[in-house]
Amino acid sequence: MADNLVIVESPAKAKTIEKYLGKKYKVIASMGHVRDLPRSQMGVDTEDNYEPKYITIRGKGPVVKELKKHAKKAKNVFLASDPDREGEAIAWHLSKILELEDSKENRVVFNEITKDAVKESFKNPREIEMNLVDAQQARRILDRLVGYNISPVLWKKVKKGLSAGRVQSVALRLVIDRENEIRNFKPEEYWTIEGEFRYKKSKFNAKFLHYKNKPFKLKTKKDVEKITTALDGDQFEITNVTKKEKTRNPANPFTTSTLQQEAARKLNFKARKTMMVAQQLYEGIDLKKQGTIGLITYMRTDSTRISDTAKAEAKQYITNKYGESYTSKRKASGKQGDQDAHEAIRPSSTMRTPDDMKSFLTKDQYRLYKLIWERFVASQMAPAILDTVSLDITQGDIKFRANGQTIKFKGFMTLYVETKDDSDSEKENKLPKLEQGDKVTATQIEPAQHYTQPPPRYTEARLVKTLEELKIGRPSTYAPTIDTIQKRNYVKLESKRFVPTELGEIVHEQVKEYFPEIIDVEFTVNMETLLDKIAEGDITWRKVIDGFFSSFKQDVERAEEEMEKIEIKDEPAGEDCEVCGSPMVIKMGRYGKFMACSNFPDCRNTKAIVKSIGVKCPKCNDGDVVERKSKKNRVFYGCSKYPECDFISWDKPIGRDCPKCNQYLVENKKGKTTQVICSNCDYKEAAQK
């Protein structure tokens, strides 16, 4: 029997670590948390200083029994759960269940699961850090008090199965606020004038800039005609040439948030999938003869700090592969994470290149590892150097400007370029070599009419970025928060963008009226700051909870008394039940709308419903536009009020009217190209990506 017992969260992690520690150590998994607040009741005594009532999680009895059996036989028990607040809390709960001494130095932490890192951590065990535990307890108790007080009110007044929470309610608010911006958006007309110019055999484009040495806004066609009629022939002169050298630095290595964003954009991974695959890479991959090794550092972090050892190894790799001129000369500028001295997400060894690892990884593991590896190595490389040139092209009072850039030294861009929404700005645009006084010929002057566009709906990547920018939640909360608002049917995804549902808007309005603090961004940010202060030992967790609950309790009492019961009426489905002949109605279920017999519970007939696209019928303005299929299985769009309304369209209506003729706009797909066009006139615009 091994003298030393080591407890970690997962079997994969246990398997990897046991190989490093040898026969004197037995490593077993707790399978995550073993204790938590009960699901059947509040589990927090608000009359006894918010004392939590922890119980063994249902189904974990056999695990706990096994842990106790091994702990009883071992001389030493080490708690090696993850190196964050959640991991610290798991270690504390294990110590309580196993009745370990509070002052015992039995907590080991490592940021990467490699032989050296694990062995080093066992040389320096420490006591459980209660400040970190208390910060996690405070978050858990806060979320319990909010959820278990608001949810019953929503069940009673709106619909069973609903929930609200500190982070999820703010995320829902962001989606709804953006939708309201789109609904209230009034498009404004504007014009641009682009010129094509020729110098010798070279052609290049430039945009209208100034009239009479001042910016001149082209709001209407009349403004455009003022410029075009002022032009005299096709001869222009280069009146100014500005050349600059621009340095572009690489992006920092990944944090949890930036990894989720970039994986969504480059790999089309959802946040939950990104974290699942990252966990596999962290906990260990079987590299056959090399053994099982964790390929990346811990994946829940808000730090961009990099250890000196990792920097030195990256520098060695870059020098050998690209030459010394490609290594970074910059001093470190990474931010320190709020939770503790974590590192950024990086490969545990730069020398384990994606190509070398490919045969050991699944397709998803390889793609994510390659992304993490390239981002990290690029972060340690020299900046790119761009030569930029700006040309002023003038005729009389009219000035056009052309901007160009070429890459002088690729630096980190040899390996990796961060995805940007404005990716066109990264492309090379060569201009002919021109000097002040040179003459050029305009071969084409092209005015174009445009209309301002509403702000785009949130993609998952953009929502994660906004939550991080606002300091809402923590790295570990982004993925489950986004999952929750979808599972509750508060939002739905359309073309990879979030749209609020009717139910989501109803819940939001009730929470906004009766629990304004819960959806207040500033309140949520302040609460995160207080949780950080608990972790730092500057304030007690009970004081933070009491400061919140004393006013929140009054909000709950007011909501119970004043919130009116909202009846979400069943919509008529427009057809009769084929079982009993009663009218069918449309009901809202966990996974969206479905048809059910109005004679329930006597008749339990249900059936799937045609898919609503969330747009009102542009013909009758009463029904919803629904997706249907023709006899040849081709998708078309019709009105849910059919046959009373015979609206039909092969193209998908988008819920906005044409700014030119006020007819409805549709999304038109031709091959791989999608654009928004008017159903009536020649108006068109780019589709939201």
From Swiss-Prot:
CDD domains: TOP1Ac, TOPRIM_TopoIA_TopoI
Binding-site positions, Mg(2+): E9, D82
Matching Pfam families: Topoisom_bac, Toprim, Zn_ribbon_Top1
Residue ranges of domain Toprim in the record: 3-113
Swiss-Prot/TrEMBL GO biological process terms: DNA topological change
Transmembrane feature ranges: none
EC number: 5.6.2.1
Chain intervals for the UniProt region annotation (Disordered): 328-357
Active-site positions on this chain: Y298
Gene3D superfamilies: 3.40.50.140, Bacterial Topoisomerase I, domain 1, Topoisomerase I, domain 2, Topoisomerase I, domain 3, Topoisomerase I, domain 4
Site (Interaction with DNA): H33, R139, R140, D143, Y148, W155, R300, R488
Cofactor(s) it depends on: Mg(2+)
Enzyme class: isomerase
ZnF region ranges: C4-type: 577-603, 617-645, 658-681
Keywords, alphabetical: DNA-binding, Isomerase, Magnesium, Metal-binding, Repeat, Topoisomerase, Zinc, Zinc-finger
Function comment: Releases the supercoiling and torsional tension of DNA, which is introduced during the DNA replication and transcription, by transiently cleaving and rejoining one strand of the DNA duplex. Introduces a single-strand break via transesterification at a target site in duplex DNA. The scissile phosphodiester is attacked by the catalytic tyrosine of the enzyme, resulting in the formation of a DNA-(5'-phosphotyrosyl)-enzyme intermediate and the expulsion of a 3'-OH DNA strand. The free DNA strand then undergoes passage around the unbroken strand, thus removing DNA supercoils.
Quaternary structure and partners: Monomer.
Family as reported in the entry's similarity comment: Belongs to the type IA topoisomerase family.
Protein name, per record: DNA topoisomerase 1
Organism: Staphylococcus aureus
Lineage: Bacteria, Bacillati, Bacillota, Bacilli, Bacillales
